[in-house]
Swiss-Prot record:
It holds the Pfam family Ribosomal_L32p. One of its GO terms (molecular function) is structural constituent of ribosome. The keyword Glycoprotein does not apply. Residues 1-25 are annotated as: Disordered. The gene is rpmF. Keywords: Ribonucleoprotein, Ribosomal protein. This is Large ribosomal subunit protein bL32. GO terms for biological process: translation.
Amino acid sequence: MAVQQNKKSPSKRGMHRAHDFLTAPSLAVEPTTGEVHLRHHISPNGFYRGKKVVKAKGE
């Protein structure tokens, strides 16, 4: 089991935890349909960056 060599000061502990907070997901709006989706993911209608890339289930 790992054992620390030296005690981490409260300041260093705070710096270590500085990026542990949650961030809201970055959302994008599809220009053709106007739907909101996660960035770098296709929209529910199968569009990505204005082009139809996947057929939707109902098509």
